[in-house]
C-alpha cells in the first residue's frame, strides 16, 4: 500500500510534539506555503473572538492573542471609555448685616401748677361756712415732679411724682393787742407716702393776739350775737 501512496504523490507533513503541523516561515515571519495540505478558507481554523489583521496564508492554525498574521483577540481602540467627571461649583456668598442704631431723644418735663384754694385746711373750710369772717391771705402752690423733671422750689422726689403744698394763713384780729405771750404759731404737717408718690402738706396759721386765744375763740368773736365783738 505504501508504494501506491508514494506513487500518487502522497506527502508527509512535519508535526510538532503535540501533533500539530509545523509551518515554515521566512526571515520576515511570513508563512511559506507547502506543496500539499489544506488550502483556502476550508483549511483554516480560527481561535479567538475578533481579529484585527487578516491572514491570507493557507493551512495555518493560529493560537494566541494579537498575532501579526492570523486571527486573534486583537482588540484595541483609540477611544477608551473612562469616567472622570469633574464637578465644579461656584459658590456665591451672601452676607447679611443689620446694623440698626436706635437713638432716643431725652425729654425733660417741667410742670408747675398753681392751685388757689384746692387744698385748704380744716379751719379754712370752717371759716368759709361762717359769715363775717375774712381770710387775709391764702396761697397754695402745687408743683408736680416727674422722674426727670425738677421744679424751682425743690423738695423730694417720689417714684412717679411728688406734690408739695404749702398753705399759710395769717389772721389779724381787730384789737391787735401784744402781750407778753407775743405770737402764737401753729404748724401742722401731714405726710402721706405711697407707691405712686409723696404728698407733703404744710399748713401754717399765724394769729397775733395778746392772751393766746385759740382760733375758734377768734371766730366766735366775729360772729354776731355771740357777745365777743368789742366794737374796736
Curated annotation (Swiss-Prot):
GO terms for cellular component: cytosol. Induction: By abscisic acid (ABA) and water stress. The keyword Zinc does not apply. Residues 1-92, 131-156, 173-232 are annotated as: Disordered. The keyword Signal does not apply. It comes from the Eukaryota. Residues 73-82, 143-156 have a biased composition (Gly residues). It holds the Pfam family Dehydrin. Residues 1-12 have a biased composition (Polar residues). Residues 131-140, 200-223 have a biased composition (Basic and acidic residues). One of its GO terms (biological process) is response to abscisic acid. Keywords: Stress response. Belongs to the plant dehydrin family. This is Dehydrin DHN2.
